[in-house]
Amino acid sequence: NKENIPYVTIEEFKKLKHPILLDTREEKEFDISHIQNAYSVGYDNFNAKSVKQKYSNLNDTIVVYCSVGIRSETIGTKLKKLGYKNVYNLYGGIFEWKNNNQPVVDNNQEITDNVHVFSKEWSEYLIKGKKVY
């Protein structure tokens, strides 16, 4: 990571007032599990125009995350270029979230242990939870 987008830890995230949480993983990853109240914006199919329409206040606090923080940094950088002023990258992504016993939910908003690990290489970073490929 180049750290263009400042990190926010899990504890810091929990103290934020009404953050907009954006999941920058692919839809199939989001469908397996995601952090509650997150909105899927994708990575390969990220659509800046639709994000701007949905979140028009450039002063809103936005927290982006992915598996470990690489893709979310890329999307966070795009958001900054669109004019968003308060963009943060969730440190360690959904893997760090799950490794710290934080809940993730499936598409039915049911708590699940499943986490899409993106690849075998990245799967080593998920210590807790059930790895899904």
Residue ranges of model-derived segments:
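Rhodanese-like catalytic fold shared by cysteine-dependent sulfurtransferases
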Residues: 1-10, 31-60, 73-133
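N-terminal capping/interface segment
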Residues: 1-4, 15, 20
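Short hydrophobic beta-strand that contains or immediately precedes a catalytic carboxylate
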Residues: 13, 20-25, 38
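A general structural motif
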Residues: 18-19, 59-61
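Gly/Ser/Thr-rich loops at beta-strand to alpha-helix junctions
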Residues: 67-71
